[in-house]
Amino acid sequence: MEPGEVKDRILENISLSVKKLQSYFAACEDEIPAIRNHDKVLQRLCEHLDHALLYGLQDLSSGYWVLVVHFTRREAIKQIEVLQHVATNLGRSRAWLYLALNENSLESYLRLFQENLGLLHKYYVKNALVCSHDHLTLFLTLVSGLEFIRFELDLDAPYLDLAPYMPDYYKPQYLLDFEDRLPSSVHGSDSLSLNSFNSVTSTNLEWDDSAIAPSSEDYDFGDVFPAVPSVPSTDWEDGDLTDTVSGPRSTASDLTSSKASTRSPTQRQNPFNEEPAETVSSSDTTPVHTTSQEKEEAQALDPPDACTELEVIRVTKKKKIGKKKKSRSDEEASPLHPACSQKKCAKQGDGDSRNGSPSLGRDSPDTMLASPQEEGEGPSSTTESSERSEPGLLIPEMKDTSMERLGQPLSKVIDQLNGQLDPSTWCSRAEPPDQSFRTGSPGDAPERPPLCDFSEGLSAPMDFYRFTVESPSTVTSGGGHHDPAGLGQPLHVPSSPEAAGQEEEGGGGEGQTPRPLEDTTREAQELEAQLSLVREGPVSEPEPGTQEVLCQLKRDQPSPCLSSAEDSGVDEGQGSPSEMVHSSEFRVDNNHLLLLMIHVFRENEEQLFKMIRMSTGHMEGNLQLLYVLLTDCYVYLLRKGATEKPYLVEEAVSYNELDYVSVGLDQQTVKLVCTNRRKQFLLDTADVALAEFFLASLKSAMIKGCREPPYPSILTDATMEKLALAKFVAQESKCEASAVTVRFYGLVHWEDPTDESLGPTPCHCSPPEGTITKEGMLHYKAGTSYLGKEHWKTCFVVLSNGILYQYPDRTDVIPLLSVNMGGEQCGGCRRANTTDRPHAFQVILSDRPCLELSAESEAEMAEWMQHLCQAVSKGVIPQGVAPSPCIPCCLVLTDDRLFTCHEDCQTSFFRSLGTAKLGDISAVSTEPGKEYCVLEFSQDSQQLLPPWVIYLSCTSELDRLLSALNSGWKTIYQVDLPHTAIQEASNKKKFEDALSLIHSAWQRSDSLCRGRASRDPWC
């Protein structure tokens, strides 16, 4: 976006904020309450005013405080400087903005800006907003509209160092929002005209800050507030305001332009759960617009109000949270009233007597069938709003006229909802046979026996695992792994010759899967039929069998993992949902949960489900630890962050963004694909059990969270991956791709035999006292200019006795920095790919930002990183013999060959690392309880190979490899592969040390655990 467009957008947002405030004051004859810190209307205003004043600053960290002190009276400056909770100039800038709003003097200050352009150019770049005469004039005109609006803002607010407004979780629950404090006249008959005024005067401009930053209503501030003060990017010359003080772009705002807009995760109440939320926060619903929307829907067909129909649509778009709609009734049932579906059956039963009446607010005859549900929405929503009105949330009661046109008194509906009708007449209509029973779950019976709440437990497993026969952009189809496996059938994706033949004959494994799939579908249909019988009969006396089924579903609902049969494709007898555990699950205690709530969670009262240890880049040889955090709103992908913010949120994916989940070959990877495939995230599991555990946890989180059916498909055919792998194997084996059979595919660590053949090397991590391990001249990044240009300087670096010293020059004796590489001060080193200079790497420090260094060549950089990593792992690597470096890679086993290779996950291009013939293997050696094996090769083979040491992720993966090896070897020699135990103590110790190093190294790859595997992560 060009600089002029960015500035125009900022001023447009200010205009909308001011007009919104003016609309309240214009529509009210009584005295309007003062605006306070916690009011949402202040968030919008201060957010955009702060944008305007920050745009183009040369020094963002100082804010505009350095400028406004020249124009501000001495008493005000002293008042701001002595604030106890504001510690930075950026925070003082916003405190000054609050003071100017309190005094209604912001317009006067901007006039001083106009008269002192020379002073402005001292602190702003030339294309700043306040340095543009036209933009500053318009800015001043807009601000003049705030002259008669009363503000009572507290200046001493601790969040001002980080944001121009109060984060949601800072807001006291007992304080009413500005809209709740408005006089009743604003909520009454003037509501429609108020919103119409806002819509007309806004000239059809949306509340869209996507060019600048997400607005305060589009995301929660939880992921930004505790961090270092984030300020707008300084790419003023490029005209792109990529980051703002308000925080990173929210993923929800990226989807506003897509056709199938998703529901905001802010509304986490599942509409299919009967229990309503006890309180509704002001961030979830705005009472003024809730009531006005109902009134507008009731009056939409009146000829006098026809001119406001456009405004009604606009208000709905602005205040409703969009989602993928299955029907009109679903659309109206949930967005503003998450709990209103508890009365849905009553509304449907009431609507049966009015089938012939016109649908409310609908012009298309196609929606006539939905009229019974639609007509009931208005009164039920209004009634529910009045029922939930509490002293903490004053929702004004208003008269609803929509039911009067339909001949049904509102009092009857209220009586029915309050349980004053005969239970035998409740829910008189069964839902259509093609409708999922989750979308039409019954509501509260008037006099329900103390049974389980079956509307909360209906998870409709078939809605989640929609067995897609063909994945997008695939050539051939494959079977779904999540079909329940039969006796003797492997749980992994079939890749044996028999499975390949079945795929060719049955069109992707149809010979195996139809019967279990039909059985599962039949079970779901039978359960749905039982539910229909329950709806048709009196609810107070359901059948005993149905009680057991529904109670079982209810008992399963709170469990983080669903049943094995539903989720992971294994038989029911293999464990209950509560027993589904995996060693990669990280148990979060209260301290860690507090860290997550402060640094990660985006929503108020966001609930944690699972924290799972996974990784990325394994198949490419660039293994990095990743924590996958599942809440009721998002899938968070976490890396190790800076000291001030221990968790770095690499990505937050809303459940409503997920389109489908693709499982890789032999379930070694899981790919999350968002709507329109705009974002894809490949996660390494390297373990079949972990993949199943993750998928079960993901489904459970979505069902209990904000995602509504239909759930994302699970694609398990891995067709494209199979084709790419077959092509690679065919090229290496010099055969046709159709003749390739893959017996095993896994993500492993492999000791390169070329390094092993060189023999053991002395360990450099513990040099003799007084020796210098490494020294030399390097460049280090000294800072970054306001335009983003990096400044690099030379320095002399010495690594001695495990301590890294940085000197300005070779002749200096006083170091600029000294770091104990083996202690808590350092967390490791890694290659830096985001700098301007080549051959750059980072030394990760615990008490300050990373030290970024740059070498003259790739070889020099590799040598430095090797020495630094050895120094960091001093406490892990045993003294004496250092294990050979292990390469994270893919291991592929075919009918006659073994391959180790790297795979580019973007292009599916394979690069071979090592090849061996299966027939050349003479024996396999293992250690009981350890997840590694040694492949011994025959000495009389044509190609003499040293032993291969292969480390896997767990013992179950080792068993899978050994089974595939034995099966392939037996096919060749008709006898079992010789299996021995590792006898030599030195080798056993060496392998175990290497395994320990792998476990700690994949943590240290992102400075996890400060280089100590025994510590909890990121404490």
Swiss-Prot record:
Q: Does the keyword Endoplasmic reticulum apply?
A: no
Does the record bear Membrane in its keywords? yes
Where does the record place the region Interaction with KIF5B?
1-310
The membrane-topology field of this record reads:
Peripheral membrane protein
Task: Show the InterPro entries listed in the entry.
Answer: PH-like_dom_sf, PH_domain, PH_domain-containing_M2, Run_dom, Run_dom_sf, RUN_PLEKHM2
What domain of life does the native source organism fall in? Answer: Eukaryota
> What happens upon changing residue 869 to D?
Loss of interaction with sifA
Q: Which residues carry this modification: Phosphoserine?
A: 441
One GO CC annotation, please?
Answer: endosome membrane
Q: Where is this region: Interaction with sifA?
A: 762-885
User: Compositional bias of type Polar residues: which residue ranges?
Assistant: 243-272, 279-291, 417-427
User: Basic and acidic residues composition bias: which ranges?
Assistant: 516-525
List GO molecular-function terms, semicolon-separated. kinesin binding
All copies of the PH domain together span: 771-873
* Sequence ranges assigned to domain RUN in this UniProt record: 36-158
Q: Where does the record place the modification N-acetylmethionine?
A: 1
Q: Where in the cell is it found?
A: Cytoplasm; Lysosome membrane
Alphabetic keyword roster: Acetylation, Cytoplasm, Lysosome, Membrane, Phosphoprotein
Stretch list, region Disordered = 230-458, 471-525, 557-581
Q: How does it assemble?
A: Interacts with KLC2 (via TPR repeats). Interacts with KIF5B. Interacts with BORCS5. Interacts (via RUN domain) with ARL8B (GTP-bound form); PLEKHM1 and PLEKHM2 compete for interaction with ARL8B. Interacts with ARL8A.
Q: What does this protein do?
A: Plays a role in lysosomes movement and localization at the cell periphery acting as an effector of ARL8B. Required for ARL8B to exert its effects on lysosome location, recruits kinesin-1 to lysosomes and hence direct their movement toward microtubule plus ends. Binding to ARL8B provides a link from lysosomal membranes to plus-end-directed motility. Critical factor involved in NK cell-mediated cytotoxicity. Drives the polarization of cytolytic granules and microtubule-organizing centers (MTOCs) toward the immune synapse between effector NK lymphocytes and target cells.
Q: What is this protein called?
A: Pleckstrin homology domain-containing family M member 2
**Higher taxonomy:** Eukaryota, Metazoa, Chordata, Craniata, Vertebrata
